[in-house]
Amino acid sequence: MPQRTFLMMLIVICVTILCFVWMVRDSLCGLRLQQGNTVLVATLAYEVKR
């Protein structure tokens, strides 16, 4: 049962991060979250409009 709870928690966190990145994708270049010894870095690749 604890493994199932951990898996559900991980899925919720991943979906939340994906939704956040999707909502601010036009103004977000990079995201860095740090909690204890864990660091999550997300960087978006984009091309400059000419």
Swiss-Prot record:
Keywords: Cell inner membrane, Cell membrane, Membrane, Plasmid, Toxin-antitoxin system, Transmembrane, Transmembrane helix
InterPro entries according to UniProt: Hok/gef_toxin, Hok/gef_toxin_CS
TM spans (from-to): 5-25
Entry membrane topology: Single-pass membrane protein
Compartment(s) where it occurs, according to its Swiss-Prot or TrEMBL record: Cell inner membrane
Family, per entry: Belongs to the Hok/Gef family.
One family name in Pfam for this protein: HOK_GEF
Protein name: Protein PndA
Keyword Membrane (UniProt): yes
Function comment: Toxic component of a type I toxin-antitoxin (TA) system. When expressed is involved in cellular Mg(2+) release and degradation of stable RNA.
Claim: Cytoplasm is one of the keywords in the record: no
Gene field: pndA
CC annotations in GO: plasma membrane
Organism name: Escherichia coli
